[in-house]
Amino acid sequence: MNYTNALPDFLAMQRISFCWFITQGLTEELALFSRIQDFSQNTEYVMFGEEYSLIKPSYSLLIARKYSGNYRAQLVIPIEVRNKVVNSIRYHNQFPIITLPLMTTDATFIINGCERVIVSQIIRSPGVYFEKNKNQKTRNQFKKKLSTDINKLRSFIPSGEAFISEFDLFFPLPTSIYDPVKKKKKIIPHWQSNSIYYYSIKYLKQKQQNSTFYFLQSFKLYRVASKLLSSKSKQRVIQLFLKWLKLKNKSFEFQDEKQIYLIKYFNFLLTSLMKYEILQSSLTTKFNEDKTILLSKFTKSNAILNLSDKQIINLSMIYNKLIINSQTLAQMELNSNLFLITKEPREWLTEMSNFLFLKKQISKATFTLKSFQELTQLQNLKPAIYFSISLKEQLKYVFGKNKLTYKSDRHKYLKTKTQFLLYRKDHEIKTNYNKKYDEKDLYTATVIPEYGSWIRIGFQRNTKINSYKYPLKSQEDEVIIQLDKINQKPVLYLLKEMGLTDLEIYQNLEYADFFYFNKPLLINSKRLSEPLSRFNLGLSYFKNISEFSRIFDPTYYRLGRVGRLKINSRLNLKMSERLQTITYEDIFAITDKLINLTISKTVQDDIDHLKNRRVRSVGELLQNLFRIGFQRLGRKLRNQTNKIDSGQLLSFNIVNASIREFFGSSQLSQYLDQTNPLSSLTHRRRVSGLGPGGFDRDRISFAVRDIHPSHYGRICPIETPEGQNVGLIASLTTCARVNKSGFLETPFWRVINGKVVKTGQPVYLTADIEDFYKIAPADIATNKDNYLTKNVIPVRYKQDFVNVTPSEVDFIAISTIQVVSVAASLIPFFEHDDANRALMGSNMQRQSVPLLLPQKPIVGTGLENQIAIDSGMTLNSYSNGVVSSVTANKIVVNDKTGKRLTYKLQKYLRSNQQTCINHRPIVWKGEQVKSGQILTDGPAITSSELSLGQNVLIGYMPWQGYNFEDAILINERLVYDDVFTSIHIERYKIEIDRNSDTLERTTKNIPNLNPREIRHLNDDGIVTVGTFVRPGDILVGKVISNNTSEQLPESKLLRAIFGAKAKGVKDNSYRMSDGEYGRVIETVTFNRRTKLTYKFEKIYVFIAQIRKIQVGDKIAGRHGNKGIISRILSRQDMPFLPDGTPLDILLNPLGVPSRMNVGQLYECLLGLAGDKLNARFKILPFDEMYGLEISRILINKKLRQASIAKNESWLFNPYAPGKMVLIDGRTGKEFENPVTVGNAYMLKLIHLVDDKMHARATGPYSLITQQPLRGKAQHGGQRFGEMEVWALEGFGAAFTLKELLTIKSDDMQGRNETLNAIVKGQQIPKFGIPESFKVLLHELRSIGLDMSTYKINRFNSTKRYEVEVNLIEKYNALSKTFSPTSNINDISF
């Protein structure tokens, strides 16, 4: 295979897929549903799917086509019905489960006599995708955040919602104010006043370890003491503290600033510490009993405190009381700002570090801490606040490089909290957690399983709570999992629900610090080894398991092989590909990946990349269909409760029904487009994004429809419909194929050290692998040894273009037409066309009608032969042999083995699009044929090449305005010489209605008809073959028995007396409809299956029309240059060439520059040269590899050659190449300027004026609105629209407008009266009210608005009264008047 003009089989994708289904896919599904139990679980249906067999179709292909049958085989499976109670087999037999439509050799299915095709579907591949959240707001700066480090003290409540402070501790400076009375500076510590927020932050800088657990524990006790004890004991405790603070002998009214300061500092700190709910959980009775033990243990551990036993007992009593009273304490509001206040940080920290009890040995302290911890653990004692063993962090403040100094003037204006917070932003130093996770982009992961609904995992902010009022609730963004619009919950909830512990989750997550604190903690009771969660998790929540557990269940969610491979590669997992369910590892990996994407700058997944899209071909669609059918069957059998009986096996029809439904009405099962061989071929190579599980065309974005770099060589960038499906329906390129996993591949030649290796098969690459290699395009020149000749080669690498040396190139594309689809590859010189026009060109080739006398194109691309072979519209030889006989109806070939193979030709058959399918033999008797050789030509195929149109002589010049705006002027030669003549075959379906009431039958004896009208019918009343029929002619004569009620009294009497059976009959014949004509070529009659008295059930009559080209038909070139014929000019009036040849077609020259489809000029000039030289050209696109402007050089060269060969110098004018002087046929004078003339390949499109022309005088009306129907099929009228109304209004044609709105449209009464008046020659009466207005009134009444009209009298009348007029019931057009009002004041508005 040279891959230049011989390419892989175009229909292989469909055929391979169906064969896979028959051999593998079917057994897979049958194995999945091998056992089905019924409702009672007593009966079991066992299917032996491995042993299935297919029974040969009852109809052959041709019979199925002709008689509207189905080409399908019965699928037979051995089935057992077992009774599990008595363990017996009730039924064991081969059972035909379904009838499966079979694919023909042309990759189509025959359903009800029509060829249908199952279009491949391109959908998102199963796997996981990460995308950035759209419309993400930047995070709110007022939002309080937890830091990662435990320097924010965290209070333990079972609900986990208390923190000591959200911010780092910071210290406003006090100011001194001069007090004139005491003649002394007075210190006002600002934490007392409301102005606490006015001040900026100073950071402490302290390195040594200066705090332990007991330091703060004592503060806590002191605070409790001051609240709970009597004033005497309170004083004692305070004195105790003052003793620690070296302030023993002083009273409270200190003169010394330092001491005031210190006490205030303590008070403030302790207020803050205690402003939380201390405990929620109630204490056990056991603890109350064991209080004494606790006290004794507590006293033993007093070595650390230099205090007497009494004081220690006091303290522990206080602690005890604290715990007991905690239940009664109301939950206090969190004070979100904790300020440690000091004047000179260094000085006061040293002062604090001198406290006696801090000078004790640290090691002892830790030991005691451990014992204290064990004690609390035993006694289920929950300390109110957790601390890290070293609180060094808390007092360690770093001065940043951008340290901002305190500016008093600026602070004067900070009045509100908001202003302060805004200013505070400048000074705040971010903690590790904030730095890591703050203000980053958020992502969402979407898991798409092969079976089951999509699962979304992503960040979601808890936005329902007002973060300013309730800073506790406004936690960090949580990672949530979402099954649908309603069901969602945090991932941690789900994992804990499934029984995982915090520790397991912590160890499995790479970014566990997002969810858990990662510093050593003093932790209470049983959760000693568990990490502390950052988020509020209600503990009682995990007892019940929700529907989210379903995602781990293969019956609800199945990733499939492809999904598992995709997830493994995306998340770097090493799971076995047999494990096709979602696992915990997947959830962990996805969560990690989400957080990783958040903190690292990475590109999100490109969902439009072809590595993330896969193709589901026929086989897989059918396999899914079987799965659905068997699921329905299982459900049905489970719901059946009646007794066991083999008759229950009838429920297997439900599988059959789902298959019929799919082939009959699915979006992917389409009526094959058989206009011409190309259209049928491209239809079978189409991939659609629509259909079940695909996109919804109304809600789809532009990105999905757009061309993507990964489409290169896989999906055609050109061929796609215009309109709402653009980009959603595409075509495979010429060389693309689908691999086992459903991903598209395209072939490349390997390049090693600058040499193209063209031995053997090319390498097929999928889109994701291709991104890692440097790939050169096909139009790079090579020498005869296949070495790349250029020094710098442009390559595609990671979806970008880079220039490299030949040695760096890894692969090279195999063909220049590898990029485009089959239809686009037929356009010569399409590299010179604008893409939009190339799109129109490739779409219009599919609409071209097969002509009576087709011609091969002079200028082609070399693919015409293969398209003709693969299209399935020709007969190809099955094996090598010798032709023994050829007739118009069959060809007989003798095989080498002596077998006689008979090929039946299709003669004048109707295609799905009413075009004519006709085989003409092109082999002769005695010829040796090879396997795969074409034996016959088909529609639009001449000598085994695709021939969609005609080579005609065209000129680009205006002619009297007849080619204005894409109109086309043609020569009458095209009509008389049948150049653009085509045959169309219409099928008329006549059904014989045989109800019990109306016995309808076909007959030639039709009452009250002229014998001339029935002379063309046979004895059964059916038209004879060969008759030419016109509108109104009878196709099938039918009579229907007259109803007895309509009979005359005499005939009724006769029937009553004699019991006469002979009823009267009336004519009910089927006649040709308006505008239809043609010759009857075949009639097909269908007999009833039951042996009833009457023969026919329905009759098909096939009528062929020969349609010559006429004004209004649409013709087009291959470059998107389409137009409507505006006038057929006699040949003597057409402009002619210097040698006297008149042109065939005149096109408008203005259609070229603005549309930029210059390829048509190259084509027509090369066609002219080919016509003169009697040569044909095969031009592959993208020919610049042979030199610059090579297309132009080739054409000039060939034109010059032709002018020399023919000795006609006018063919090539070196000053205006391609232009010739034309002579006007009417005057004989030359035209002023030379004109471009050439031989172009023009197509006649299926949009024929005969099918569009339509007229109506009277006809059917719509039932509700009573307006004329619309459309040709309903014999409808033309809508008189908004703009037409403007035209009448502009001319003031009021009566015309009124008529249009009433009697010509939907005023029923007026319509009838007008008709009456016209018939009787009377004056036309006044009009009534349009029906649509009445409908409007009814609609208004249905929403409770009563619309009525009132009659108001004249001004001069003295009487005043109102009369209600009902517009709908008692309406009389003549009596209705509107009088002027009697009194202006009576009119109420």
From Swiss-Prot:
Gene3D superfamilies: 2.40.50.100, 2.40.50.150, 3.90.1100.10, DNA-directed RNA polymerase, beta subunit, external 1 domain (2.30.150.10), DNA-directed RNA polymerase, subunit 2, domain 6 (2.40.270.10), RNA polymerase alpha subunit dimerisation domain (3.90.1800.10), RNA polymerase Rpb2, domain 2 (3.90.1110.10). InterPro entries: DNA-dir_RNA_pol_bsu_ext_1_sf, DNA-dir_RNA_pol_bsu_external_1, DNA-dir_RNA_pol_su2, DNA-dir_RNAP_su2_dom, DNA-dir_RNAP_su2_hyb_sf, RNA_pol_bsu_bac, RNA_pol_bsu_CS, RNA_pol_Rpb2_2. GO terms for biological process: DNA-templated transcription. It is found in: Plastid, Chloroplast. Its EC number is 2.7.7.6. GO terms for cellular component: chloroplast; DNA-directed RNA polymerase complex; mitochondrion. GO terms for molecular function: DNA binding; DNA-directed RNA polymerase activity; ribonucleoside binding. Keywords: Chloroplast, DNA-directed RNA polymerase, Nucleotidyltransferase, Plastid, Transcription, Transferase. It comes from the Eukaryota. The keyword Nucleotidyltransferase applies. It is an enzyme of class 2 (transferase). In plastids the minimal PEP RNA polymerase catalytic core is composed of four subunits: alpha, beta, beta', and beta''. When a (nuclear-encoded) sigma factor is associated with the core the holoenzyme is formed, which can initiate transcription. PANTHER family: DNA-DIRECTED RNA POLYMERASE I SUBUNIT 2 (PTHR20856). DNA-dependent RNA polymerase catalyzes the transcription of DNA into RNA using the four ribonucleoside triphosphates as substrates. Belongs to the RNA polymerase beta chain family. This is DNA-directed RNA polymerase subunit beta. It comes from Phaeodactylum tricornutum (strain CCAP 1055/1).
